Amino acid sequence: DIYWCTADIGWITSHSYILYGPLSNGATTIMFEGIPSFPDYSRFWQIVEKYRVNQFYTAPTAIRALAKQGSSFLKNCDLSSLKVLGTVGEPINEEAWQWYNKYVGRNNCPIVDTWWQTETGGILISSIPKVIPDKPTFATKPFIGIQPILLDEKGDELKEFNTVGKLCIQYPWPSIARTIWGDHKRYINTYFSAFENKYFTGD
């Protein structure tokens, strides 16, 4: 597959999902220097067409910025090579999700909404194309082997639907950050002191 993640190369997303991830899985990866609005707002879609991109991974901020320009910049671009779309970096709102689905995915590409952090080393919560149905604005299910838990302020598990709590991960996973360089106490205090024996995400 031809895979394109539009993240800035200095961010963990690009380390994991432009370099290490795609290349270690035998994919062809695209590195892009520039902004999606220059020389005009069709820049992303011209690249998708030129290189026949199959998997496209970008941030909701970029999607919202492009959606504000309408759909005219996509009309003359062939996006038929796209098979999977992804979002990363922040929650995606309903309007942006629907625009992405309709105009970029042509209502024919699963949208993989991902949740993770620099400290997690990789995606922990995400839909899986063709396995878990898309649900607009939701990252949906934990990835294989990941066991998230929602806690109240006292550390008790919340099992009700549509409730607000503190997102934690119950057990370690292979890519978890091991420490903060030169300050292991800070690492423990930041991620493991709020709730005993659980990784606190801050979300």
Feature locations, PLM:
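Alpha-helix/helix-capping structural signal
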Residues: 61-64, 174-175
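Conserved ATP-binding/catalytic segment of the ANL
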Residues: 157-162, 168-203
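Conserved AMP-binding/adenylation subdomain of ANL enzymes
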Residues: 1-5, 9-55, 69
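Short coil-to-beta-strand transition motifs
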Residues: 138-145, 199
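Gly/Ser/Thr-rich phosphate-binding loop
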Residues: 1-3, 20, 24-27, 54-58, ...
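Active-site glycine-centered loops adjacent to acidic/histidine catalytic or metal-binding residues
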Residues: 8, 89, 116, 140, ...
